[in-house]
Structures are given as C-alpha cells and as structure tokens.
Amino acid sequence: MEITADGYKTIHEPGTEMKICTFLWTYYGYPTACYEGQNVEMVRYRNGAIMARDDAQRYPEMDVDYVCGMPASGIPPAMGYAHETHTDLARPFIKYTPTWLRSFTPPNQEMRNQVARMKQIHVPGLIKDKKLLLVDDSIVRGTQLRETVDFLKQSGVKEVHMRSACPPIMHSCKYLNFSRSNGEMELLPRRIIQELEGNRGQQHLDEYANPDTERGQALLNWIKETMGFDSIGYQSLEGALEAIGIARCKLCTYCFDGKE
C-alpha cells in the first residue's frame, strides 16, 4: 500500500499469510518500535550477542581492545556483542547528523561515496594502536567499507575486524522501495560472486551465503583481502531469526535467500 497526502492506493494485493520484513528489526525499524511484540532495540541487542556466541567458536583466539558500533543502528548489536564477550564498548566514529540519513539510499555511487565520507567523525584516541571489532547493521553495497578501513589504517589502527549484523544480502528487495537497487550487481556479494565465478557463480548463492562452505569462505576471503580487514563475518540467517524470536513462516527473508 502506498500512502500519500491525498489518500492511499493498493500496490500489491494482500496475501493470505503474514510476512514481515526481517530487515525491519535489523536496519530501518525505529529503536522504540515493537513489531509483533518484539522491540527493535532488544532484537538488535540479542542479535549482537548471538554473533558473539558464534564468533567464540569460529575465532576462539581473537582478542580485541574495543567493540565498536557503526552509527547508528550498528550500535545496539555492538552493545550485545560487547556484553556477551565482556569486551569494552567504544565509539571511534561519531555520526555527523547534518548529512543524508542513509548512505545506501542516494541514487548514484558518487553521491553515496560522498555521503559515506561526510557522515562519520572520528576519535583518534580510540583508534591508534588499537584492535577494533566493528559492527554494522548490514553490508548492502559496501559503500563505506573500503574508505573506513583505509582511514583506520592511516590513523594507526592495529587490527580491524568487521561484523555484519545481518546475513549477506543476495537479492534486491522486490517489495519495498527503500532497499531497491538499480540491479542485483550493485549488491556487494553479487559483484564478488561475478568476479570469482562469473555467471556460473550466480547459480550457487546459497553456498556463498554459508560460511561453512568452500564458496562461502571464498566470499569472506575476498572481502577480507580486498578491503583490508583482519577478519570478516556475517550474522547467519538462523541467528537473525533467533534474535527476532518470531516463527520463520511469518517473516520475509527474500533479500537473504530469495524465498518468497
């Protein structure tokens, strides 16, 4: 349904079963809002704790000075991660609010890059000689990743580990305008897959989304080596669903797994 100043119109006839966008809790839901009884802020906090629990198995030797949330919706999962791992929480980046609210919403890449540069102000004392684990709500096009790492390296950071609070986004949303891309190849994982295997790789999206597969590891290694991270990890779809706490059949996961 589209609501305007003059009324509303039906874009798509309603289905027979409820399907709520999983990204609602991860990214664009307001922190104080509750959907189906699940508060956005608390879901994001649980999401970070679940990532930390899984990381303890995947990276048992990892040791960082600070867990850092990328403003603004990366902060709650960072808090959950820090609490679960008994690690200090820090804010090396402060959001500069008089810019575009979301860096992935401008229509062209040049403008997205400019917004990404403008929207963060750094705190040098929380970066130099520190080992940081950054948590962001999602990685859609990767607009900020390379510039963030380059900046941190230039500022003397010792290590940079990156975590995404949602699974790899493999499909452009076909239902909501807020996340529609000009094409699937604007999505970072799809571009990487095309570079690694060409069109053949696009037939194995499920494998690339799974870090326990050879293709999944290839995707992570590409991001790690190309972007300059010391490690990179995504929340699993199962972990995200666990954090939300609603039956999977009531949630839309199309952008992650392509299932309608």
Regions found by a protein language model. Give the residues of each.
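PRPP-associated nucleotide enzymes
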Residues: 2-260
